[in-house]
Amino acid sequence: MSKGPGDFKKSWNGFAAQTPQNTPSSDVHLSKAALEKARQTLQSQLEDKSAHDEVSGLLRNNPAMLSMIEGRLSSLVGKSSGYIESLAPAVQNRITALKGLQKDCDAIQYEFRQKMLDLETKYEKKYQPIFSRRAEIIKGVSEPVDDELDHEEEIFQNNLPDPKGIPEFWLTCLHNVFLVGEMITPEDENVLRSLSDIRFTNLSGDVHGYKLEFEFDSNDYFTNKILTKTYYYKDDLSPSGEFLYDHAEGDKINWIKPEKNLTVRVETKKQRNRKTNQTRLVRTTVPNDSFFNFFSPPQLDDDESDDGLDDKTELLELDYQLGEVFKDQIIPLAIDCFLEEGDLSDFNQMDEEDSEDAYTDEEDLSSDDEEILSSEISD
């Protein structure tokens, strides 16, 4: 799976979910500036990790020092700094009252977020007839009626045969969205050509979250007609009053044959018996990069090591961001993605040679070089 931007809101309890209150309405696609900022953030994190590893190495080589530090830290857990206890009783009572008032604020904030989700669900139902009509045209179930056409739009004439619907509509959409397009392999394209619709619905009742549905025509790879991916929010809000992601679940893909499974590949190795000198071929299955890994989201284990936890956290951040991209960008703005309109068009048209990364710093200009440069500028 391709790595993506890691610039996400975090808390100890999860990742902040985008809602109608914090989702940028004009951010159709990930901009180059955002990606560069994420790259710089990742570089900073790598530098911090390097320093952390160095300190960890020193502590591992000095068990006495490590034991002393752990003892000091364990004695501080849950221990007050003593400041509150030093205040006058009347002041402590006022602080207690403020804590109670804050609980009232939290309850109102939770009610507000719930109402926002209810409002989003209400308007989601208004979108559904439009999205259903869009799907009919894309699939070729029916043709546009006169009222749906803009007769001022230029129609280019040619002698090409008239296909059914809009071929490879969703594959083109996904390719044109940077974060998702990076996940698609040439082998994935063979399946994604049969992708006929993508939908989302908010979860109902006491369960908070949303579900993505990917509808496929018959293909030579799996038997599923619909693949779903469901994102769940936590019941509690973040300190800033936002819903937090809890976990995601994806459908099991029913591959027609093991060799059709795009998420794994078979590696063959030759082994030689030391005693008999005979050789044999050993086949092992290893993970493979594929868009369809999206339906097998990473899961955090309680006994995960620190390094493993960091890697899983990055994958979780990317997975949640992908869900938001589908829900807030690809599905509601599918035609913009297909036509490469909006921010994405500007991003894709930038030549690599124009980017900052394409240039390297050279030595300071000599006086002769400066004269030549000044001459070229003046000309």
From Swiss-Prot:
Q: Where is this region: Disordered?
A: 1-30, 345-379
Pfam annotation, one family: NAP
List all Polar residues biased stretches: 16-28
Q: Which UniProt keywords apply?
A: Nucleus
Q: Does the keyword Phosphoprotein apply?
A: no
Q: Does the keyword Nucleus apply?
A: yes
Native source organism of the sequence: Schizosaccharomyces pombe (strain 972 / ATCC 24843) (Fission yeast)
Q: Name one GO molecular function term.
A: H2A-H2B histone complex chaperone activity
Q: Which InterPro entries match?
A: NAP-like_sf (IPR037231), NAP_family (IPR002164)
Supply one GO CC term from the record.
Answer: nucleus
Traced from the root, the source organism's taxonomic lineage reads: Eukaryota, Fungi, Dikarya, Ascomycota, Taphrinomycotina
Gene3D superfamilies for the chain? 1.20.5.1500, Nucleosome assembly protein
Q: Which domain of life is it from?
A: Eukaryota
Q: What is this protein called?
A: Putative nucleosome assembly protein C2D10.11C
Family to which this protein belongs = Belongs to the nucleosome assembly protein (NAP) family.
In its UniProt record, which GO terms are filed under biological process?
nucleosome assembly
- Please list the residue ranges that the record marks as compositionally biased, kind Basic and acidic residues: 1-10
Q: Where in the cell is it found?
A: Nucleus
